[in-house]
Regions:
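Short, well-ordered beta-strand elements
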Residues: 28-40, 59-65, 103, 130-135, ...
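Short, low-complexity disordered leader/linker segments with a strong preference
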Residues: 1-31
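Pocket-lining segment of extracytoplasmic ligand-binding domains
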Residues: 89-90, 164, 171-233
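A bilobed periplasmic-binding-protein/Venus flytrap-type ligand-binding module shared by bacterial periplasmic
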Residues: 47-49, 113-123, 217-233
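Ligand-binding cleft/hinge of the Venus flytrap
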Residues: 46-60, 143-165, 174, 180, ...
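Short beta-strand->loop
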Residues: 34-38, 131-141, 153, 158, ...
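Immediate post-signal peptide segment of exported/extracytoplasmic ligand-binding proteins
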Residues: 23-33, 53-59, 98, 120-132
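Short, polar/charged alpha-helical segment
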Residues: 37-77, 94-97, 144-152
């Protein structure tokens, strides 16, 4: 089951091609400098890098991976990077800070966030009341997504749930594996990795499904966009 899920995740990543971005991003002597976060926001770059290795790409791409978005933002603003896969909410901030110098090229990540636990106690957002939840992505899309879902469930994110923010998804995973009562919000492929390390771990909530339920019947329903690709003009 784990091999099948991992295969599906990689296949989905390969479906997303960003070849058109090369015409937009600035060229440098060492190629187009791309930054990505460790996790789902970078999975969409797999096809691009595969094409470069096979000699099918139009130019060289230099990919650098980072653990947090705040490591990428200043490099983009300073011109040390040409493109980046970042949390969706940061795109608007970068656009404003650079007076339109950095723009969105594509949406490359939808959803992929899950509430996981070691046990069988959480079945609705209400079940998170009084629990400690390990989350990565403070000030980014993951925080806004969980706050929205908790609020719509009648919970106060600051009072009813103990949100413990971690620097990286890997830190959330470490806390989850170290404590049998821990609950964490993780993206793929970290969920799959966690399931290979803890046999009692289960996906309690699919936040994409929870988000979509809240959009039903709305005047302007939206999708949970978690990652985009941005580039300098």
């Amino acid at each position: 089951m784990m091999k099948k899920l991992t295969s599906l995740l990689l296949s989905a990543a390969l479906m997303i091609s960003l070849l058109a971005c090369g015409a937009f991003a600035a060229k440098t002597e060492r190629g187009v400098r791309i930054a990505g976060l460790k996790g789902p926001t970078t999975m969409g770059l797999v096809n691009l890098l595969d094409m470069e290795r096979s000699g099918k790409a139009s130019q060289h791409y230099d990919l650098q991976l980072y653990g947090a978005a705040d490591e990428i933002v200043p490099k983009l603003i300073k011109g040390e990077l040409d493109m980046a896969a970042i949390p969706a909410n940061l795109a608007a901030t970068l656009y404003q800070k650079t007076n339109g110098g950095i723009q969105v090229m594509a949406v490359n990540t939808l959803g992929v966030l899950y509430i996981v636990e070691r046990g069988d106690t959480i079945h609705t957002a209400e079940d998170l009341r009084g629990r400690t939840l390990y989350v990565s992505g403070k000030g980014a899309t993951p925080e806004y997504a969980i706050n929205y879902i908790l609020t719509e469930a009648g919970l106060d994110p600051e009072k009813d749930v103990d949100l413990q923010f971690c620097a990286e998804h890997a830190e959330c995973l470490t806390n989850l594996l170290a404590n049998e009562n821990a609950v964490a919000m993780l993206p793929q492929p970290f969920v799959t990795v966690a399931q290979t390390k803890a046999s009692d771990l289960r996906v309690a909530l699919d936040l994409t499904e929870e988000w979509d339920k809240l959009q039903e019947g709305g005047e302007a329903p939206s999708s949970m966009i978690t990652g985009v690709v941005v580039a300098r003009k």
